[in-house]
Amino acid sequence: AVPRLGADFLEAEARRGGVTDAAQARNLARLACGDRLELEHLLSGSGDASRKEDFDLFCSLMRLSYNDRHLELIGWAEEAAQLSREQQRAFLRDAARLLRESFMLHAGIPQIGYLWGEELAFCTKFAPFVGTRNIEPLLAQIEEASAQIAQNGNPTIVFTHFALAVSKMIRHL
């Protein structure tokens, strides 16, 4: 296996790639996790649109879940079902990542997180609702939904069940 590249090297690469702010270059190097290709993706902005769409879908799900807006959650599930299967699975992976990051913020160890910008702002506010009692069941729901999507389950049914299950878990810490 090829070892990961050092943060200093990636930071220098980010600066060569056009990043002028030292803090932003350091942050991009950290987010790349030692992967030069990931740094190039971050620098080029490729995948930003889908990542933003996933983030907006996640925020919407969590806000509706917290407020117990069940009819709107069904509408959310129909919206999520319109995505392609790969986009649905990518959303679920991203949702798991954001929940884990929120849990780390809740646990008081933000320095090991990989959030920035509006993801960091949202997850900082959302962190109190992701605790030791609900993080594992939430991640289990995500894994179950992802497996069902991979097995060609009806996405409307899968996401409706997923959204309603998440709603029950977010309110009960």
Question: Where on the chain are the PLM-derived regions?
Answer:
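Charged, glycine-rich active-site and insertion segments that engage polyanionic ligands
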Residues: A1-D94, L98-L173
